[in-house]
Amino acid sequence: MDEQRFNQLVEQLNEYEGVEEVFLLNNEGEIVFKSTSIAPLTVEEAKALLRAWKEKEPSLNYQNSRYAILKNDDIQLAAKNIAGGKGNIAGSITKDGNYLIAHIAPDTGMILLEWSIFVNKVAWS
């Protein structure tokens, strides 16, 4: 996926209020593209996040906060920060085998599983 396509996906995700940050990771967990540098995701954090997804761990860490993984399969991820109110993580594998991951604000018009489905739909569009 090239940067122009990534930016198109970010625009599609931003059609709904609440997307705080979007990342594209490759299969090794390296950051290919990111939508902002406000709260930068480190390479180590990206690799740990992808490892938690692939190995179906019960939780993941993002920006030093724990997110309970509520949905975790080969193509979709949905995780919620329950205790700290830090929002949600929704992700999907893309057609080319990369991983599109969005950090979502805690209060939006959609619930987490709807976000997970939406991120998947955008990733496969």
What are these regions (language model features)?
Residues 1-125:
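Non-catalytic interaction/Regulatory regions outside core domains
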